């Protein structure tokens, strides 16, 4: 990562010595007066079931063999007979919101053979896979049936002989009204003492979407956390001011920090961070870097691009000695890793999350350097949702309790609260596009924020892999696509020159221009050295912006 060598000062030295220290604060001391209205993320719930042995009045039941589950029956009447497919709920179910569905015992009287009752959900999918074997005279079909009061409607019927049963179907919304139930049965024709045997059982699941009730969350602004960190590094004394320039990136202007303990509503919630984590987050996510004003004791975060002004602030008329040019290999990277550290949710929804790490190759094979633009703060929507779901359920520590999350939210003067920003972005390839949030913090937007710096060594980033959902597209642009970078801030060339001109410019953001051996050079100050006790000139090390021949 590029760092411009700043003039040595007491404030810079203080920050350097304490930047890695992690500080903790009570959220109540830093929080905004108004809270974030978190209106939740729609997620999948998965009810898993397994079959069990059942005898429906067979006088000569077959015994199971190996891993078989056997359903025995006897149908002595003419026509078809209907039996409930014996299924029991598994402890491997992932039910995050039990208020929109109730798992049932399908053989309990009054449940109409149903395995689940719905009270308000938008989508349901039934999936199954297992092997089945039947007796010689057993002719059967498996049915998925919607139960609405006394009315029963067959949604899907699977006719099958011996072999693998692998089906899935979506339940139409018309059958998902409050109180509707879902049952699975099988139909057999006439025959005495018949059976079907199930083996090699893989799964039988009912997945449904749900969205929980909204909650309010305490939030902290980035500039408030910055000033708290500066005060802590200054021995809890006032005197150092932190500022974040606004009006450059709306993703930052509308950014709010959510401490993990606030998401869980833990009493006396705390927030944990070091200055280094804050700085790394600002740089990776927004391309913002700090400038230090020792005279005014001020740390200002602004976009890196603003530190490279294309106006000439000094012309060196005479190069006295030590002219050398080289390629700065530290500015050349073969890979770029951007995003966030991957988190394992142990959930079916985890595969939907896309705010993890994406890896790109630059086409450069001269080095094996990797540019890591990894945010230590988290933007994963599912991480926030799962923490909120833990509210009131337990008080034990969670491995995510020390984490910091952030969201994009605007203050609503009508409702007097912060509300998530979802407008302005069209997202596809996720479970619930309508409720998804933080899409503006995807790895692709992080690359855009750092585009001109990446452009120094790579005009094109070629997508290689992702730790998360790589099928997402935002505003019609795929997250797994290649990315062209911006106009480079400078080149990888580095020029060292010594001059007897002792007039060092006070503005280090502009260009230094000089001519040497029929070429004109311009570049930005990377480092200067001036030994006043010895008359040996001023030594400049420049990051070259341009080289042109002198006609």
Where are these regions (language model features)?
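Solvent-exposed serine/threonine-rich low-complexity stretches and specific carbohydrate-binding patches
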Residues: 152-163
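Short, surface-exposed beta-strand/strand-loop-strand elements in extracellular ectodomains
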Residues: 139-151
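Short beta-strands within extracellular/lumenal beta-sheet-rich domains
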Residues: 78-119, 166-168
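An acidic/polar, Gly/Ser/Thr-rich interaction patch typically located in mid-to-C-terminal regions
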Residues: 1, 93, 242-551
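Surface-exposed cap/loop segments at beta↔alpha junctions
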Residues: 1-88, 167, 175-240, 538-551
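Long, low-complexity intrinsically disordered regions in eukaryotic nuclear regulators
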Residues: 85-94, 123-125, 129-134, 152
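Trp-centered recognition loops
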Residues: 162-169, 275-276
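Extracellular beta-strand-rich recognition modules
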Residues: 116-140, 167-170, 177-190
């Amino acid at each position: 990562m590029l760092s411009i060598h700043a003039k040595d000062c007491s404030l810079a030295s203080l920050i350097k010595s304490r930047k890695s220290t992690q500080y903790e604060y009570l959220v109540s001391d830093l929080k905004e007066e108004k809270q974030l209205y978190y209106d939740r993320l729609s997620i999948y719930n998965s009810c898993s079931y397994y079959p069990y042995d059942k005898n429906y009045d067979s006088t000569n039941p077959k015994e199971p063999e190996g891993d078989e589950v056997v359903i025995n029956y006897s149908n002595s009447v003419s026509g078809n007979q209907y039996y409930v497919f014996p299924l029991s709920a598994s402890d491997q179910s992932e039910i995050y919101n039990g208020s929109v569905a109730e798992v049932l015992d399908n053989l309990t009287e009054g449940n109409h053979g149903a395995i689940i009752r719905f009270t308000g959900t938008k989508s349901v999918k039934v999936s199954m896979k297992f092997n089945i074997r039947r007796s010689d005279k057993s002719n059967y079909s498996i049915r998925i049936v919607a139960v609405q009061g006394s009315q029963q409607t067959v949604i899907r019927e699977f006719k099958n002989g011996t072999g693998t049963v692998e089906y899935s179907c979506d339940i139409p919304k018309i059958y998902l009204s409050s109180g509707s139930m879902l049952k699975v049965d099988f139909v057999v024709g006439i025959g005495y003492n018949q059976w079907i045997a199930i083996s090699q059982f893989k799964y039988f699941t009912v997945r449904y979407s749900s969205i929980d009730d909204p909650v309010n969350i305490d939030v902290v602004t980035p500039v408030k956390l910055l000033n708290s960190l500066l005060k802590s590094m200054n021995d809890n004394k006032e005197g150092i001011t932190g500022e974040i320039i606004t009006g450059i990136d709306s993703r930052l202007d509308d950014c709010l920090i959510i401490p993990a303990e606030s998401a869980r509503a833990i009493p006396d919630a705390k927030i944990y961070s070091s200055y280094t984590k804050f700085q790394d987050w600002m740089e990776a996510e927004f391309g913002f870097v700090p400038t230090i004003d020792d005279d005014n004791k001020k740390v200002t975060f602004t976009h890196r691009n603003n530190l490279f002004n294309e106006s000439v602030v000094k012309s060196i008329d005479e190069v006295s000695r030590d002219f050398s040019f080289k390629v700065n290999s530290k500015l050349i990277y073969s890979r770029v890793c951007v995003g966030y550290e991957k988190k394992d949710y142990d959930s079916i929804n985890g595969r939907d999350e896309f705010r993890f790490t994406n890896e790109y190759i630059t086409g450069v094979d001269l080095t094996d350097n990797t540019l890591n633009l990894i945010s230590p703060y988290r933007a994963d929507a599912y991480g926030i949702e799962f923490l909120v779901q833990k509210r009131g359920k337990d008080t034990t520590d969670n491995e995510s309790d020390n984490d910091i999350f952030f969201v994009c939210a605007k203050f609503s003067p009508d409702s007097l609260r912060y509300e998530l920003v979802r407008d302005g972005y069209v997202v596809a390839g996720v479970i619930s596009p309508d409720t998804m949030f933080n899409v503006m913090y995807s790895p692709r937007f992080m690359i855009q924020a750092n585009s001109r710096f990446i452009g120094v060594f790579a005009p094109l980033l070629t997508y290689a892999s992702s730790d998360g959902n790589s099928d997402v597209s935002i505003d019609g642009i795929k997250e797994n696509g290649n990315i062209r970078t911006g106009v480079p801030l400078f080149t990888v060339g580095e020029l060292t020159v010594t001059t007897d001109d002792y007039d060092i410019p006070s503005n280090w953001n502009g260009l230094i221009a000089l001519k040497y051996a029929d070429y004109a050079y311009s570049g930005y100050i990377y480092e200067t050295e001036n030994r006043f006790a010895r008359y040996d000139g001023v030594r400049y090390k420049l990051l070259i912006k341009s080289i042109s021949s002198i006609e």
